[in-house]
Amino acid sequence: MLNFYMLSSGSRGNSTVIWDENDLIIIDCGISLKKFQEKTSELGIENLEKSMFISHEHSDHSSGVRAISRKLQADVYSRGKTLEKMHLEKGYSIRGEVAIGNFTVMPVSVDHDAVDPVVYVIGNRGIKISVVSDLGIISQELLDAMQGSDIMAIEANHDPEMLRTGPYTEMLKMRIRSEHGHLSNEQSAEAIYVSASDNTRIVLTHLSEKNNTPDIAIETVKAYLYNRNKKYASMETASQDFGSTLYRL
């Protein structure tokens, strides 16, 4: 059985755990050791081999890496430049797919204002999970890599109108809207339309607390897909405090 659980999602911290009977894959670690332990205490993952994959160096994805990897004795993987930026001497620099037990973890380069950012597409015995956030545009390479995901955890960061009228400075608004920023709800919907299948479970992630709401994100994406007769298995938003549903595949 393959398990997926997003522990936390948003500008104050991101972390996702995916595991089978032997191995635990951690995607990003932007939360504290205490919160990680609280969120995972009843998952039964203590005795699994643990590996951590970091998408980029921003603190909401990496602040807990040192403490948590040390406590769990987890190997850390990321792009070489990202490891350097995080001052992690013991991490493993990756370019292509990494095989760990029954898992494959494929990094896909994305556009974001970090040194060498990636997202991850995870495979395990025919099951595919895509964990995609912190990017301003979606490339054809990424659309192809996500194709037919069983779980698609994808950024729906902002509603453009809320961003336009919101409290951020114009410079920050421009950064968020740029090709190196974050996906809007409609950009997320466009990617889902192209890459999801009828059986895809959709998790909308990294929602801005100031420029989006769960209801607006869900309504925007659902309306886009409904108007194009696009089917999918389920849809939810992941939150900062409660994460996502625990999925067992």
Q: Language-model features: where?
A:
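Conserved beta-strand hairpin/beta-sheet module of binuclear metal-dependent hydrolase folds
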Residues: 1-41, 47, 118-134, 151
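Binuclear metal-dependent phosphoesterase catalytic core
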Residues: 3, 101, 123, 227-249
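Structured catalytic core of nucleotide-sugar glycosyltransferases
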Residues: 6-15, 57-65, 105-107
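Active-site metal-binding loops of divalent metal-dependent hydrolases
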Residues: 8-9, 29-31, 57, 81, ...
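A general structural motif
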Residues: 22, 47-49, 73, 126, ...
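Active-site metal-binding motif and surrounding structural segment of the metallo-beta-lactamase
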Residues: 32-78
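Metallo-beta-lactamase
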Residues: 76-127
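Cap/insert and terminal regions of metallo-dependent hydrolase folds
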Residues: 140-239
